[in-house]
């Protein structure tokens, strides 16, 4: 089997597949003014049949995990059709999703029934008012209800992501609140460092804080760093004997962050992106129009990997093509 391997020996069994740029939230660090269509890009989002052809080709390249992202993937009316086809026909062993959770309490049972293998839910604060200020929506209680429903269904792979923000969720009291949340819940909670994108420089300068503050808290409170294989990805994971859940840290500005990169990205309009913050992307959509194009599609993807750089160079202020995280499925 052909596999996705770059010139630095990194393998890419994991694809983050955006199926829409649209998001109904107004998160302060991503889309503070809400979603606005890019007038310079008139292309539609990939159709269900195009996504189906894409995932079948990816399965022949050793891809074993696809994460559906956006925007907010569940705003697509055919979201469950896409999920169902991917689970039944693509030969991809693991299909997961990232969501803001706005419909989670209503669709949790369907997600379970359709065979979703894992879910990442964005919750930047467990304080209802703070959550509302950050997202523009007073939906925290509904999201927590959705998580509870998933747990009652014995849904195992639940992760909660929070962007670490200065003065908002970066105190020991905040960390303890999240710790209490996972103490008796088998949930992986991960803090993600705020990343600079093309349109958030001022916000980044004001609100970025190093994840070291959280790692120091974990060390002080006897959390144990958990190590995995070299293909496990860039997250640092921590366990504690008194907690059912786990803590994680994603620190893109840390040294050697890109050494363990194991993923590629495909945008909702069918562009292959080798890096979230890369300067290059190539459209593969023209090879998603007919089943007979699969071999050509496989070859095109393979031939792009030599262009993948060793690092994202975020520390140099390079944000590449990423205007905001909704456009590339952060």
What spans do the regions from the language model cover?
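Glycine-centered loop/turn positions within well-structured domains
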Residues: 25, 128-129, 256, 282
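Residues that scaffold the ATP/ADP-binding catalytic core of kinase and kinase-like folds
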Residues: 26, 30, 76, 129, ...
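Residue-level recognition of short loop/turn positions
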Residues: 26, 70, 269-270
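A short acidic, helix-capping loop that chelates divalent metal ions and anchors anionic groups
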Residues: 36-41, 127-134, 198-202, 283-284
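Radical SAM/AdoMet-radical enzyme domain recognition
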Residues: 45-68, 72-192
